[in-house]
Amino acid sequence: MSSEFISKVDKEARRKAANILRDKFLNLVEQLKKGEPLVMEIPMRTLSNAIYDEKRKLLLLGEKKLRRNFLDLNEAKRFMQTVLMASIIYDALVSDEYPTIRDLYYRGKHSLLLKSIEGNKIVSEENTWDEQKESDSVIVDIEVFTSLLREEMLILSKEKGKVVGNLRIRSGNDVIDLSKTGHGAYAIEPTPDLIDFIDVDAEFVLVVEKDAVFQQLHRAGFWKQYKSILITSAGQPDRATRRFVRRLNEELKLPVYILTDADPYGWYIFSVFRIGSISLSYESERLATPDAKFLGVSMGDIFGNSRKKPYLSEAERKNYIIKAKDADIKRAEEIKNYEWFKTKAWQEEINTFLQRKAKLEIEAMASKGLKFLAFQYIPEKITNKDYIA
């Protein structure tokens, strides 16, 4: 690849990641020189090692570590896989390449032949890895071991989130105006830290779970009317979207509101944005947005409560409500026991759901009319601070 087309930001990111990766694994060489056994200490990525920091409102990785010993027959293969993958990633960095996680799987996949002591007979044959989930897990191990996100190592993944609004950014060598995307939107790139924010004219960020609702709000001109940055995660958010939202909040000081379906899966999407996820707790400090607010759709929006009237009439509730399934009930009961859902407001929300056994999609609010959703429901809830923090 010709380096003349690579931006300075990109080159600096490569240099930094390559240096950290090299130095971390050179420590293994030093162990060998000293005659010490080859050992890697990697923080454990388990639920038991995920700790909720109440003060910082973040789900963080605990201090438990696993020791990966090359001389341990149970760990030798995983040790080999980790070193192999690190070598492939390092080569890609210094060669100005942009591998995907699928590329890395294929680049490292080959057979290892174990020969007899005499060297004239193959005793056994084993693949470096058989399935991509193996190599993906190794990449995560390297992230935890080096404290480098895969995005920082210029490893690409499929773009998922989209954004539109009065914001100009620099990506690579180009300046992109996110207010001039027509009926479309800017796809949030898998390396959001390489984006520079040039200027912004917005008062808040609205993240919408559903892509279809995002498109409706975009075409209705919601972000123009209310000077906002409109984003969709298109379901469960990917890492790039979470990091982009975090940067908008942290660097541009824009409040963040999350709009999801009124069900346990929508609540969890909100919590992933706000405090992080259990599986990626090692990344929460860079991906989560502790200041994010749950705008809705809430049980109070559907049924009302002592503080507010419902947005839906009895007839509308009858038409729009979806009966919760057993899986929904089970998920709600699980979420209810998570430390970060034990606030008074969230316990009330979850208990109402369990009592009513009812859920609602965002589209139901749009069924009352797009103007209702865009120009009454959302702005009214923001103005009245009708959200769960």
UniProtKB/Swiss-Prot annotation:
Gene3D superfamilies recorded: 3.40.1360.10, Winged helix-like DNA-binding domain superfamily/Winged helix DNA-binding domain (1.10.10.10)
Binding sites annotated in the UniProt record for Mg(2+): 209, 261
Domain Topo IIA-type catalytic: 12-162
Function of the protein: Relaxes both positive and negative supercoils and exhibits a strong decatenase and unknotting activity; it cannot introduce DNA supercoils. ATP is absolutely required for DNA cleavage; the nonhydrolyzable analog AMP-PNP generates nicked or linear products from a supercoiled dsDNA substrate. Generates staggered two-nucleotide long 5' overhangs. The enzyme is covalently attached transiently to the 5'-ends of the cleaved strands.
Activity's thermal dependence: Optimum temperature is 70-80 degrees Celsius.
Keywords assigned by UniProt, alphabetized: ATP-binding, DNA-binding, Isomerase, Magnesium, Metal-binding, Nucleotide-binding, Topoisomerase
Family: Belongs to the TOP6A family.
Native species: Saccharolobus shibatae (strain ATCC 51178 / DSM 5389 / JCM 8931 / NBRC 15437 / B12)
GO BP, sorted A to Z: DNA topological change
Taxonomic lineage from the root: Archaea, Thermoproteota, Thermoprotei, Sulfolobales, Sulfolobaceae
Cleavable signal peptide: none
Complexes and interactors: Homodimer. Heterotetramer of two Top6A and two Top6B chains.
Gene name per UniProt: top6A
UniProt name for this protein: Type 2 DNA topoisomerase 6 subunit A
InterPro entries named among the record's database cross-references: Spo11/TopoVI_A, Spo11/TopoVI_A_N, Spo11/TopoVI_A_sf, Topo_VI_alpha, TopoVI_A, TOPRIM_Topo6A/Spo11, WH-like_DNA-bd_sf
List of catalytic residues: 106
GO cellular component: chromosome; DNA topoisomerase type II (double strand cut, ATP-hydrolyzing) complex
